[in-house]
Design a protein with these regions (language model features):
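Switch/communication elements of ASCE P-loop NTPase nucleotide-binding domains
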Residues: 1-50, 250-257, 261-281
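Acidic, Mg2+-coordinating catalytic modules of nucleic-acid enzymes
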Residues: 47-59, 63-281
Length: 281
């Protein structure tokens, strides 16, 4: 028998009927065999073996969210290391790309059935997946979704003022290689109403409503795939981290703080034992 805590190679290569997870929850040990696992678990084992070695797993909807969270974890880990606290690795955390919204619920549910602590992080613009997400939630999966009707790009843009939108467009230029390309992306959204520049304050001075500017930029970023790979997600995450305390991003940060709380759970301080303390009568 081989017991591993860190080697995904063993998880990948072993016959699945020979695999089992072992969880210790407050002294109660639970062993769950993967024998007879369905096709979904087989795919998870092959594509994301590290998830089966984790204590806590965040299933992110896609590459954008995956990269965004990786960048956030790097920043949070750095600060926690400076503070002398545990990192995400120390907490046994794995971030998994769910490969799309329809996969998030079933994947999170399958991992939860193995006894793992699981969170699902996804968009909130597709009602067709609500049932599978609710099913996962009933098993104890922590579900973190953006505001109703929003995807990642829409959530971020929803609170930005003109200067914040212009700053986001500058990030788009870095990823799309030129200002002209980003301008073409924007004008492809509303070809009958082109914008003259990447300065959103100029748009507004010419009559564009702020909400319309937010929607156009969010749609362009989504449809032209500015952040639709892990590197793009990381770039977006880095931009959020640099502006984390700005009020314009408060609605986005509120959801990221939920993920942070899941990744680094608070534990009771056992340094002070007052069980024998006597009170004055």
């Amino acid at each position: 028998m081989i017991v591993t805590t860190h080697s995904p190679v063993i998880v990948e290569q072993a016959q699945i009927e020979n695999l089992a997870t072992v969880q210790n929850q407050e002294g109660v040990v639970t062993v769950t065999s993967l024998g007879g696992a369905d096709d979904l678990m087989q795919r998870l084992r092959r594509a994301r073996p590290s998830s089966l070695l984790a204590r806590r797993v965040v299933v992110a909807e896609g590459k954008t969210e995956h990269g965004l969270l990786l960048e956030c974890l790097d920043a949070w880990d750095l600060q926690r290391t400076k503070d002398g606290r545990s990192t995400s690795a120390g907490e046994g955390v794995a971030i998994q790309d769910g490969n799309g919204g329809t996969e998030v619920g079933p994947r999170a549910e399958a991992l939860s059935r193995l006894g793992l602590n699981v969170a699902a992080f996804l968009d909130n613009d597709d009602e067709s997946i609500n049932e599978s997400i609710a099913s996962a939630e009933t098993l104890g999966v922590k579900v973190i979704r953006w505001d109703q009707g929003r995807n990642t790009e829409g959530q971020i843009c929803s609170g930005l003022e003109a200067n914040g939108l212009t700053a986001l467009l500058k990030l788009g230029v870095e990823l799309r290689s030129s200002e002209d390309t980003v301008l073409q992306d924007l004008n492809a959204i509303e070809p009958e109403n082109p914008v003259p520049s990447l300065d959103v304050e100029e748009w507004i001075s010419l009559g564009t409503e702020l909400e319309d500017a937010r929607e156009r930029i969010a749609k362009a970023a989504d449809k032209r795939k500015w952040f639709k790979n892990v590197d793009g997600g990381r770039a977006l995450g880095g931009w959020i981290v640099r502006n984390y305390t700005r009020q314009q991003l408060s609605s986005t940060v509120a959801y990221l703080e939920q993920i942070k709380a899941f990744v680094y759970p608070e534990r009771p301080d056992l340094s002070e034992d007052n069980s024998d303390e006597k009170l004055d009568g």
